Amino acid sequence: MQQYIAGRYAQSLYAVCGPRLESDANKFLGLLSENNFLSFAKVKTSTKLHVLDRLHLPCELKNLCKLLLANHRGFLCTTVLLGYIEIVKKNRKEADARVESYSRLSATAKKEVADALLIKFPYLKKINIAQKVNRSILGGLTIKINSIMIDLSIAGRLAKCKSIGQSTILEIFQ
C-alpha cells in the first residue's frame, strides 16, 4: 500500500515538474541516505519544516516534503523520490542494469555489455551499468535489468546441469 501511495506522489511530482528536478532529487536522496530525518517520529514536524526551509531545494521539492509531513507520511519521501527518478528514466527510455561478475570489468567490457543489452532491448536508448564483484559465480556474468535476470555464470550453468542430471536419473528409475 505504501508503495502505491508513494508511486502516486511520484507521478504527481513528474506531472508538475517533468524531468528538471532529477539532479536535485538525486542530491536530496544522497542527503537522506546519510540522515533520513524526515522519517524519524521523535523529531517534531516543526523542526523538520525548519530544516527543510534551510536547505537549498527547489520549491516543488520543498512543497512535496511539506505535504508529506502534513499528511504524516514523511517516511515516504525517499520512496517517492526514487519513484520519481524511475519515472524520469523510463520516459527517457533509460534503464539500470546490475552486472555481477567474478572480477571487475574493464570500461571496454562494460561498454560491450551495455551494447549487447541495447540490442537485446531495442526499446531502450541507454543502459547504465552498475557492477558488483561476486566470487561465488565462479566466472561469467549475471545481469539484472528491471525484472529480467540473465544468468551467464559458470555457477548457473553447473546448477542447470545438476538439475538436468537429477531429472534424468528420476526418469530412469520411474
Curated annotation (Swiss-Prot):
It is found in: Cell inner membrane. GO terms for cellular component: plasma membrane; proton-transporting ATP synthase complex. It holds the Pfam family OSCP. The keyword Glycoprotein does not apply. Its main location: membrane. Keywords: ATP synthesis, Cell inner membrane, Cell membrane, CF(1), Hydrogen ion transport, Ion transport, Membrane, Transport. GO terms for molecular function: proton-transporting ATP synthase activity, rotational mechanism. It is a peripheral membrane protein. Belongs to the ATPase delta chain family. F(1)F(0) ATP synthase produces ATP from ADP in the presence of a proton or sodium gradient. F-type ATPases consist of two structural domains, F(1) containing the extramembraneous catalytic core and F(0) containing the membrane proton channel, linked together by a central stalk and a peripheral stalk. During catalysis, ATP synthesis in the catalytic domain of F(1) is coupled via a rotary mechanism of the central stalk subunits to proton translocation. F-type ATPases have 2 components, F(1) - the catalytic core - and F(0) - the membrane proton channel. F(1) has five subunits: alpha(3), beta(3), gamma(1), delta(1), epsilon(1). F(0) has three main subunits: a(1), b(2) and c(10-14). The alpha and beta chains form an alternating ring which encloses part of the gamma chain. F(1) is attached to F(0) by a central stalk formed by the gamma and epsilon chains, while a peripheral stalk is formed by the delta and b chains. NCBIfam families: ATP_synt_delta. This is ATP synthase subunit delta. It comes from Neorickettsia sennetsu (strain ATCC VR-367 / Miyayama) (Ehrlichia sennetsu).
